[in-house]
Amino acid sequence: MKRSAQLVFVPAPGIGHIVSTVEMAKQLVARDDQLFITVLVMKLPYDQPFTNTDSSISHRINFVNLPEAQLDKQDTVPNPGSFFRMFVENHKTHVRDAVINLLPESDQSESTSKPRLAGFVLDMFSASLIDVANEFEVPSYVFFTSNSSTLALLSHFQSLRDEGGIDITELTSSTAELAVPSFINPYPVAVLPGSFLDKESTKSTLNNVGRYKQTKGILVNTFLELESHALHYLDSGVKIPPVYPVGPLLNLKSSHEDKGSDILRWLDDQPPLSVVFLCFGSMGSFGDAQVKEIACTLEHSGHRFLWSLRQPPSKGKRALPSDYADLKTVLPEGFLDRTATVGRVIGWAPQAAILGHPAIGGFVSHCGWNSTLESIWNGVPIAAWPMYAEQNMNAFQLVVELGLAVEIKMDYRKDSDVVVSAEDIERGIRQVMELDSDVRKRVKEMSEKSKKALVDGGSSYSSLGRFIDQI
């Protein structure tokens, strides 16, 4: 009889990383009844502790909230990449201690012992924890919560640096276009991921990616039909471990539990495909001037709207956006009254449930990868307005490479002083809400493919099976 095995997952902090990690764990234990998973949760100083509220999660998935690591007590940090590298490093002891508690005791019989430790599955940003896995003499795997195009881009840049001595940051202020093997079209420097905008972040990012070569495989939250070009490139002899596309990994259960909310009841009263939904992720927010441009657009667009509007943290402070105590303090005077019959402005939004509602006709999005997959799953076209991290690259892929989105401003950066005009926003909303557009047709087709990928015989189902076979 096969002995049970334990995998240790260490997601990066942040709800997007944790949610997709939990979905990955659920897929694995559903496929193999001898597999146990422990998720070690690292908490950012300004974030809430993680609590599992999903009663359907298997008893073979266990969560451990790690003690908070001792960090610099200052509210500001000069470089996010440096902060996160230090954050992960400072958790090594806590990860090690947690894993020791999972190990079988040597005097236990095989029939009563804990599952054998089979490996670590580390978040894409936490490759330095390979050192801890090596101490326990077990293999490491990477769980890449973004897309395979990002993985391919990072691997390509890492090779350019290490083998060709090329410094990508020297191009960031130019209007150059790059030949990147994982893309069909020339790739504009203006939409590079945010981690390549300065030398220190670039060094940290590429060093982290370089360590992927020490792992036994890379799980990616994508599916072959969506990213065939990038996945074929990664499978063509690139110096990288085997890549397993296993997505889309989405928490669809939570969307069903939100059915009774006021927001969804309001959507029930709207015609099919009539509402444009604006939402910019757990870290997305705008300054007052940009909020007023969006409000002006929505008031004059002629479309019904649902707008998730969050208040940015104080400038320079390490914190997440929050809900406004009073929306009238940031919106134009009288806006809420004038738009009361056609729109709703809310704080936090149950995004997955909203995107699954038949009234939603388009999604103005930051192009975070989880949000992108949710939108594709539900067949909702995107108007791309990226803000940070790899979202600019995601927008380029969706708009230019795949034709699954329209552009609002592909090269927008959250920390810039640029204010996107009402005219540009209105153009994007008008295009994304077109009922007979080619973009909408392509998204509908990709939606069907995303669902087929996960069922028996589908591309991601088969890929996950290959991963399980070699644990």
Swiss-Prot record:
Temperature behavior, per UniProt? Optimum temperature is 30 degrees Celsius.
Q: Check the record and name the PROSITE patterns matching this protein.
A: UDPGT
pH dependence of activity: Optimum pH is 6.75.
Which Pfam families does this UniProt record tie to the protein?
UDPGT (PF00201)
Q: Which residues of this UniProt protein bind UDP-alpha-D-glucose?
A: 282, 348-349, 366-374, 388-391
Q: Which InterPro entries match?
A: UDP-glycosyltransf_plant (IPR050481), UDP_glucos_trans (IPR002213), UDP_glycos_trans_CS (IPR035595)
Task: Cite the entry's keywords alphabetically.
Answer: Glycosyltransferase, Transferase
Q: What is its EC number?
A: 2.4.1.-
Highest taxon in the source lineage: Eukaryota
- Which Gene Ontology terms cover its molecular function? UDP-glucosyltransferase activity
Per the record, the similarity remark reads: Belongs to the UDP-glycosyltransferase family.
PANTHER family noted in UniProt = GLYCOSYLTRANSFERASE
Q: What does this protein do?
A: Glycosyltransferase that possesses chalcone and flavonol 2'-O-glycosyltransferase activity. Converts phloretin to phlorizin (phloretin 2'-O-glucoside), a potent antioxidant. Possesses glycosyltransferase activity toward eriodictyol, apigenin, luteolin, kaempferol, quercetin, isoliquiritigenin, butein and caffeic acid.
- Name of the protein in question: UDP-glycosyltransferase 71A16
Naturally occurring in which organism (per UniProt)? Pyrus communis
